[in-house]
Amino acid sequence: MADDAHRREAFARLESALDRLPERERLAIHLHYLDPEPVHAAKRALGLSRSGYYKTLDRARTRLAAILDRETTS
């Protein structure tokens, strides 16, 4: 039971943090991790080149980590 509650809480924090990302970054995270798409399909959906897709994904991960870090330290 405690594990389930902890998982629900962690997922809620993640959803909240994802909602705070810019739309393109949120979609990149979604396509890459939550609804895995091949890179060619994900970059096409975002209208990006391959390098642009990976740069957007990197920015999204960095921003997401910072948001989650701020939430856990405040």
Spans of features found by a protein language model:
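Major-groove recognition helix of helix-turn-helix-like DNA-binding domains
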Residues: 52-58
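Helix-turn-helix DNA-binding module
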Residues: 19, 23-27, 35-52
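Short alpha-helical "packing" element that flanks the helix-turn-helix/winged-helix DNA-binding module
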Residues: 14, 28-29
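C-terminal edge and immediately downstream basic/flexible tail or linker adjoining helix-turn-helix-like DNA-binding
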Residues: 45, 58-74
